[in-house]
Amino acid sequence: AGLLVYPRL
């Protein structure tokens, strides 16, 4: 996605 939710995979 490229959002700031990388730790919320």
From Swiss-Prot:
Chain positions with Leucine amide modification: 9
Residue intervals passing through the bilayer: none
Gene Ontology biological-process entries: neuropeptide signaling pathway
GO CC entries: extracellular region
Swiss-Prot/TrEMBL keywords: Amidation, Neuropeptide, Secreted
Tissues of expression: Dorsal ganglionic sheath of fused ventral nerve cord.
Principal location: secreted
Subcellular location: Secreted
Family indicated by similarity: Belongs to the periviscerokinin family.
Function statement: Mediates visceral muscle contractile activity (myotropic activity).
Protein name per its UniProtKB record: Periviscerokinin-2
Organism this protein belongs to: Sarcophaga bullata (Grey flesh fly)
Phylogenetic classification of the source organism: Eukaryota, Metazoa, Ecdysozoa, Arthropoda, Hexapoda
